A protein has these predicted regions:
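Structural alpha/beta core scaffold segments of enzyme domains
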Residues: 1-148
Length: 148
């Protein structure tokens, strides 16, 4: 255990509905079947790795991020509002040919923030491309659902 607040590798437990009403419905049922579903974890390692190019325009005091992301609108919202502290119109996020992703390219990653931030610091475009092997340890893994 690394931290008391996170004693295991469970990301979250998602409870939904009215437990008392559900228990009552099962108690009245003529037949009840119990199943346990396990959807194994996978590593969505696409042939095309994650990549990002950050560009800062001093003339416009605005950023452009070209990124292999499956959800550029949310990436812009999260990065502008919660990371860089910018109004959204000061950050343009472009997602051209994303390639494969299988869900792993839907998140905001630190590398996207760093290339964007660094482009202003050095007043030049900054490009970063992952190696496929690092995707195994750096990209978000998929699934690993356990439903009872």
């Amino acid at each position: 255990m690394l931290h008391e607040a996170a004693p295991d590798n469970t990301c979250y437990v998602w409870s939904l509905g009215d437990k008392a009403a559900t228990d009552a419905a099962f108690a009245k049922a003529a037949h009840v079947t119990r199943l346990e579903f396990i959807n194994n974890r996978l590593i969505p390692n696409a042939i095309e790795p994650r990549a990002a190019i950050g560009l800062y325009s001093r003339a416009e005091d605005a950023y452009t991020l070209d990124v292999s992301n499956q959800n550029p609108h949310v990436e812009r919202l999260l990065m502008a509002a919660f990371v860089l502290g910018l109004p959204e119109h000061k950050l343009r996020v472009v997602a051209p040919d994303v390639g494969g992703g299988f869900g792993s390219k839907i998140y905001l990653y630190a590398e996207d923030v760093v290339v964007t931030w660094a482009s202003k610091q050095i007043n030049r475009p900054v490009k970063w491309t992952a190696e496929r092997s690092e995707s195994f340890v750096s990209d978000a893994h998929g699934r690993d659902h356990h439903t009872i």
